[in-house]
Amino acid sequence: MQNVINTVKGKALEVAEYLTPVLKESKFKETGVITPEEFVAAGDHLVHHCPTWQWATGEELKVKAYLPTGKQFLVTKNVPCYKRCKQMEYSDELEAIIEEDDGDGGWVDTYHNTGITGITEAVKEITLESKDSIKLQDCSVLCDEEEEEEEGEAADMEEYEESGLLETDEATLDTRRIVEACKAKADAGGEDAILQTRTYDLYITYDKYYQTPRLWLFGYDEQRQPLTVEHMYEDISQDHVKKTVTIENHPHLPPPPMCSVHPCRHAEVMKKIIETVAEGGGELGVHMYLLIFLKFVQAVIPTIEYDYTRHFTM
């Protein structure tokens, strides 16, 4: 039944997107949405700092006139996925469905019981090293640094702007050498762990209706054979399957359909992050959008080790 509902919603949104005019004036600071030009600028910034991501065109007949022909969407391929979501430690007590009647089946607050007051106070005490802009260190340089801490759990989308990830503490902001750590875990797991290794192709498109980026993914087994929908769902947080994540056709590529992270809350989350940075005396540039976007959607696909900024300082 949920699949039928998602299909109907998908068709309705296709019509709505077609009828929605292209956003011309920047509303990033006010609402968290971006124009196609800002999407391209953020994409260029992502490609520069994380070169595993590249621009692509897709099918000629599906080219969107409001985007440059050679910059229709972003793609990164052969992204490793070393384990299934069910293999990760999980506790129902740490999650709660929020806004169950919002029309999308409810959203998951991953760290519901971790102490909201403490988190809020931590965000209020943010100190910014630079009040003019955000400084970013290149991913390729930081990949070579020695790691002394264990991997941290993925932050949920609504938790991100409150969790302290915006603090200037480098130990907090420095996401770990994820790929190497996961490889080590796979090696330690023996032959069974190796056989479970999958890869994913990830895509970021511009959603004209929601006026935000949208993430797509398609998976393959260890023989590079396409995964079934049910197999891909194994690599997605089960509380987001068929709610936040649905199966839809890629707007620039031919079938088969792909998993897509629904963008209905992206602007809202980004707006909160912008406000948090501003309260600390800083300014979040729109060029940082995709780097932060990839961080907060990690909660949905926690076992897929894609490339995003490893360190940024407010």
Curated annotation (Swiss-Prot):
A motif (LIR motif) lies at residues 104-110. A motif (Membrane-curvature-sensing motif) lies at residues 4-19. It holds the Pfam family Autophagy_act_C. A motif (Increases ATG3 translation efficiency by the ribomome assisted of EIF5A) lies at residues 101-103. It is found in: Cytoplasm. Its EC number is 2.3.2.-. Residues 140-170 are annotated as: Interaction with ATG12. GO terms for molecular function: Atg12 transferase activity; Atg8-family conjugating enzyme activity; Atg8-family ligase activity; enzyme binding; ubiquitin-like protein transferase activity. This is Ubiquitin-like-conjugating enzyme ATG3. Belongs to the ATG3 family. It comes from the Eukaryota. The record marks 169-170 as: Cleavage. The gene is Atg3. Its main location: cytoplasm. Homdimer. Interacts with ATG7; this interaction forms an E1-E2 complex that is essential for the transfer of GABARAP thioester from ATG7 to ATG3 and disrupts interaction with the E3 enzyme complex. Interacts with ATG12; this interaction is ATG7-dependent, essential for phosphatidylethanolamine (PE)-conjugated ATG8-like proteins formation and also mediates the autoconjugation of ATG12 on ATG3. Interacts with FNBP1L.
